[in-house]
């Protein structure tokens, strides 16, 4: 076990889906995985392991924000040997081409967080990127499934309520959406030489004001979940 995950060695698969919401983790386990067993309830950050079309997969809730996801990603990699991490989360859309319920494949993640500065020091602006093979597989699967999706840069923010951010400039620079976790996931994947991808569903739009309900965010977005599991299924055992 680790500080925040109460699971014995071997209880967690080498591929893990990472929803922020514990109830979304439970929804995925109950509706998509076969023979799912819960391995973690610490802080109600539920974790489950089961199989998807014969491939062993885990799903671990991470909570909200860079500090929280950093805890779980560090422990999954260092204490449980996880090699592939796929975030399945929500994001706020920006730009007129990005619609509510669209899927965003985060190729890279800009950030206003100090996590890059704290890691590299002043003057070096590291660019956290997705694993290309996972990204390519997700795009290919989305094409064959007729899922409406976008590939590009997202913004990982430290604050959910942030009126000071220049949204129009972000739109002008083709930032697709904003969320709160991807920079940490990609940074830690680079640090530990593992594989990571963020697959996001646009749950609300920052310009139009359109949004989904809390219930839909918790127990829906099946395109994103199915896409993530389809990618997970293709990952070779490591």
Swiss-Prot record:
This is Purine nucleoside phosphorylase DeoD-type. NCBIfam families: deoD, PRK05819.1. It catalyses: a purine D-ribonucleoside + phosphate = a purine nucleobase + alpha-D-ribose 1-phosphate; a purine 2'-deoxy-D-ribonucleoside + phosphate = a purine nucleobase + 2-deoxy-alpha-D-ribose 1-phosphate. The record marks 217 as: Important for catalytic activity. The keyword Transferase applies. Catalyzes the reversible phosphorolytic breakdown of the N-glycosidic bond in the beta-(deoxy)ribonucleoside molecules, with the formation of the corresponding free purine bases and pentose-1-phosphate. Its EC number is 2.4.2.1. It comes from Lacticaseibacillus paracasei (strain ATCC 334 / BCRC 17002 / CCUG 31169 / CIP 107868 / KCTC 3260 / NRRL B-441). It comes from the Bacteria.
């Amino acid at each position: 076990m680790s500080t925040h995950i109460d699971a014995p060695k071997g209880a967690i698969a080498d591929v893990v889906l990472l929803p922020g919401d514990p109830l979304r983790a439970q929804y995925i386990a109950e509706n998509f995985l076969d023979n799912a067993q819960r391995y973690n309830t610490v802080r109600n950050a539920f974790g489950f392991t089961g199989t998807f079309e014969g491939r062993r997969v885990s799903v671990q809730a991470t909570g909200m924000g860079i500090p929280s996801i950093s805890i779980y990603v560090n422990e999954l990699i260092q204490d449980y040997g996880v090699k592939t991490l796929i975030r399945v989360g929500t994001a706020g859309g920006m730009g007129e081409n990005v619609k509510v319920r669209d899927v965003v494949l985060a190729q890279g993640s800009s950030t206003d967080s100090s996590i890059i500065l704290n890691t590299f020091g002043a003057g070096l602006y590291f660019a956290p990127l997705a694993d290309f093979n996972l990204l390519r597989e997700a795009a290919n699967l989305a094409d064959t499934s007729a899922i409406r999706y976008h590939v590009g840069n997202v913004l990982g923010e430290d604050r959910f309520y942030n009126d000071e951010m220049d949204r129009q400039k972000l739109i002008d620079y083709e930032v697709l959406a904003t969320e709160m976790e991807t920079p940490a996931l990609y940074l830690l994947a680079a640090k530990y030489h593992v594989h990571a991808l963020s697959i996001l569903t646009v749950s609300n739009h920052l310009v139009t004001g359109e949004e989904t309900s809390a219930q839909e965010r918790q127990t829906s977005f099946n395109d994103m979940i199915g896409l993530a599991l389809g990618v997970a299924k293709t990952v070779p055992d490591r």
